Amino acid sequence: MTTQAQTNLSDYLTKRMPKRETRAVWLTTLASLDWPKNYARSEESIKLQKQELIDILDKYQKANINTVLLQARVRAATIYPSDIEPWDQCITGVEGRAPGYGYDPLGFAVEECHKRGMEIHAWIATIPVGAKNSLGCRTLMKKGFRIRNFSTGSYLDPADPGVAPYLASICGEIVRKYDVDGINLDYIRYPDGWPRPSYRDGDTPDQRRSNITAIVRAIHDEVKAIKPWVKMSCSPIGKHADLSRYSSKNFNAHDRVSQEAQEWMRLGLMDQLYPMQYFRGDNYYPFVADWVENAYKREIVTGLGTYFLDPREGNWTLGDLTRQMYVSRDLGVGHAHFRSYFLTANKQGVYDFEKQFNATLSLPHKMQGVVSTAAMPYAVNSSLVERRADKSVILRWKAVTPYYNIYASYTYPVDTEDARNLLFTRYTGQTLQLKNVNPNLYFAVRGMDRYGLETPALQENMKSSTLSKSPATLLANDGNTLTLPTAAKLTDADRYVILSLQGVILRIVNAKSVRNNQLYIGSLSDGMYSLKVYNHKKKSFTLGAFMVKRGS
């Protein structure tokens, strides 16, 4: 990441981070593009494939990614034991071959994502079915589906009345078998090479849009009948239609490929859209605003062309991408990287930027139009928190709720609307032990239901807390400058580092620029921070925490 990008980001991170924001990655299994390269052919190779996936997910977690879009149906083939379609070759290297030994790649991925507090959505490639001689395509032809072949591969005919219930059955199978958080429909449209409407036998633009919408509706109805909390989404072409001042240049969702995605939002057939906005300049910004303006109070997550950072794919600079991320966040829009490899390989420093851009944890947006089913947690003992002499704390609570979000702050009561106070998301236990905890840290817990709706917060009981008897030890400041503690003079200071509560670096200050033991903090927004000092031997010392509160 360039020095200028780091400076711009540092300035940006002093702002309050969004508590609700989808931060997603598409993990492509097609041809193992993002999927582990070790084939699962033995117990040992299964372990290697699992470890590769764990390493990928660990990188997501370190960057505070909260949503994984995992390609579960590839090209009429799957990455799980399906009763409907054959195995994809990305798992074992051979199409139709099961890995054996009880290994279920999708089941494993669901478990590992949830361990990390991340949602996992099953990405379904709908209309493409691969090469005409592939096992998946041949299987569909034997079942009597109409298949059309182009230079780019073979495709289901969206006008075939059997397509909608068939694709719905696949999505239904996944939702029944797995605790996925969403179904993400890809290529839910007419293929690029499909002939223009003939206006014969009902082949009109309106009828084509109706054909695609019928497939979407069938999948929606099947999924919601099984688990109504599973999010329905799709990835439409990045430009919905021509705008009054900006042309889509003859490639848009509504008119070119028969995707009326904004209408699906209006009808409630989609909870989210991930438009594939792999464009720059006037081909991006007016169109992301158009998606937001026509979201009908549902969620938009902009699909980023991260792969263009690789010179073999395009000529984008990191600045091209980061500007889109800044603007989308200001519009209240989440972001999704296409693809995983280009993010985790840190092309042009994009992974480093992602980690800093996501300075705090965040929750995916809650589902609209539902009533909360979560029960507020309550303390097991007199207080939520038990503090021990070894500086560890144990949080204990009870409730009948699938998830809990854990918050912490140096102020009481803990502000659970501030993302900077989020410590854990989608936690599934009812006991949490933490070691080496600052004695001035307060805690709170909120339950969360399957729809993402939170309960009121359970705060710790101050009457029974040792905190109420402890003197404040926060570093003194007036909102503009912070007085460095005496200990700072003893450290051979080289630089001071200001961090968020979660440990993300927000500011690095050269010690030579500090005058009269006063550290400038005027550009920080109100909130809680910690301060470290590094000496010339690069050894670090924690100087303490401080609160910026300037008043109204």
Features from the language model and the residues they span:
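Catalytic domains of carbohydrate-active enzymes, especially glycoside hydrolases
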Residues: 48-77, 177-180
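C-terminal tail/sorting-segment detector
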Residues: 466-469, 484, 528-552
